[in-house]
Amino acid sequence: MEFRHLGRSGLEVSLVGLGCNNFGMRCDFEQSKAVVHRALDLGITLFDTADVYGGGGRSEEFLGKILAGHREKVVIATKFGMKMGEGPHRMGGSRKYIMQAVEDSLRRLGTDYIDLYQIHRPDPHTPIEETLRALDDLVRQGKVRYIGHSNFAAWQATEAHFVAQRLNATPFISAQNEYNLLDRRIEAELVPACNAYG
């Protein structure tokens, strides 16, 4: 397996990562375990999940149990921001939600740190300054190693870059957007923005 640095960070990840969206929904625990063990056998060290995957965090729960004996050898990426229940502060990028969401993910994953913590989508109701300050606090506390974004447009990624610079806060190191042979829209603006600003 080849390894690459993620963005402009020192974090090395396997060239191929395993998406765990189906764990807890289409794949039960034993099926998920078989998939993860095969991935480990093939040299995959990057595992991507989210609090919302599997319905109510089951993907994180499955992944945490399966990787328990391999924690120091793998990179766990998870996301927050999608709706996780009824009532206020159950989604988005507010400080209040982020601080609760990270504790919930840490508990489900059975770990004391998350390698890569990503906002699942932009939050139009919360200033990016608030989101970045909260994430920076988590990095300083050691609960999160690196931060990233998912489903951001190029202008949002660029704005976040310059806001993090202005605040002297931890910057995003990753962008996780839909990209495949049929959907190559990110090549027009997001990829050049990430190449320019990290």
Predicted regions and their residues:
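N-terminal binding-site loop/beta-alpha segment at the start of enzyme catalytic domains
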Residues: M1-V75
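Generic structural signal for well-ordered alpha-helices
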Residues: F3, V36, E60, G64, ...
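Conserved, mostly hydrophobic/aromatic
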Residues: L6, L18, S32, F47, ...
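Short, well-ordered coil/turn segments that N-cap beta-strands
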Residues: L11-V16, G43-L46, H70-V74, G110-D115, ...
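Active-site mouth loops of central-metabolism enzymes
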Residues: C20-E30, M84-M99, H120-T126
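Active-site beta-loop-alpha junctions enriched in small/polar residues
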Residues: N21-F23, A50-V52, K79-K83, I119-P122, ...
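Short, acidic/polar
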Residues: C27-A39, G93-L109, A157-F162
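Beta/alpha (TIM)-barrel catalytic core signal, keyed to glycine-rich beta->alpha loops juxtaposed to Asp/Glu
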Residues: T126-G198
